Swiss-Prot record:
GO terms for biological process: neuropeptide signaling pathway; regulation of muscle contraction; sexual reproduction. This is Ovarian jelly-peptide 3. The keyword Aminoacyl-tRNA synthetase does not apply. Has myotropic activity targeting the genital tract. Keywords: Neuropeptide, Secreted. It comes from Sepia officinalis (Common cuttlefish).
Length: 8
């Protein structure tokens, strides 16, 4: 499982 969170 892969989780990616991007905050810009």
């Amino acid at each position: 499982d892969e989780v990616k969170i991007v905050l810009d």
